UniProtKB/Swiss-Prot annotation:
Glycans are attached at N111. Has a pH range of 6.5-9.5 with optimum of 8.5; and a temperature optimum of 65 degrees Celsius at pH 6.5. The lineage of its organism: Eukaryota, Fungi, Dikarya, Ascomycota, Pezizomycotina. This is Arabinogalactan endo-beta-1,4-galactanase. Belongs to the glycosyl hydrolase 53 family. It catalyses: The enzyme specifically hydrolyzes (1->4)-beta-D-galactosidic linkages in type I arabinogalactans. Its EC number is 3.2.1.89.
Amino acid sequence: ALQYKGVDWSSVMVEERAGVRYKNVNGQEKPLEYILAENGVNMVRQRVWVNPWDGNYNLDYNIQLARRAKAAGLGLYINFHYSDTWADPAHQTTPAGWPSDINNLAWKLYNYTLDSMNRFADAGIQVDIVSIGNEITQGLLWPLGKTNNWYNIARLLHSAAWGVKDSRLNPKPKIMVHLDNGWNWDTQNWWYTNVLSQGPFEMSDFDMMGVSFYPFYSASATLDSLRRSLNNMVSRWGKEVAVVETNWPTSCPYPRYQFPADVRNVPFSAAGQTQYIQSVANVVSSVSKGVGLFYWEPAWIHNANLGSSCADNTMFTPSGQALSSLSVFHRI
């Protein structure tokens, strides 16, 4: 069984304010954290934005949400975006008002990370995992942290890591680096080889390598490619690895890209979600230091496509009732 069986539930309070009431598979209304826990989830992932215009996903929002997770006995994985909005391979916008020279930016990043971690510590909330950036394959805190300057990236990541290490959290969270396209070993190898050869960012600065692995953006995203990539990562660097974002659709009438050949027989349904998540979990489990799987935003029913060309990737009906697939976490 995987050590971390998780769900990103960042948007739950946004949905609740919009009137959503979550129900388990039997139609019984409960707070989402208890529905997740009774379905085998043991950790939640939460994204943190620095200063979003509406306050959603900021630090206060996240501390409120984390209290609920802890009350339900769930572990906590904090996913820093280091931006006021979405950060991913196409967007890594430095927060408004942050410094525009690398020395001051590195200090700002250290202090922001330190202060944020101390807020959790002071609230009595244990953080289990922290990712220092989200899908930073093309760098972070642009333009200074773009991949045309690997040394800057290494400096920034070192500063972020030590913001976690110097915090009052005890025990210390595991520190994760998170890239996209986990199936692509060439990408992972290119990125880590460059960043770790610079000097400032050292192997001792972090504990885990996280990857996103989605079926609907490339036919190359096969389970075999994921297995090969994760195995190579572990044999080269020896870190724990996890799939920290994945989805499977219940509806995908107009896919923009071809699905990988090895999952084309998996149906677009709750049963298909169960089958796919079990398959991905089996790959992670087969890797010597494969420790976890996290499903991305299964309860964000007002954004059901979850950014993809598939109509619905959630694990809930439009009225907020859990699908049978949510119980897959008992079996991975």
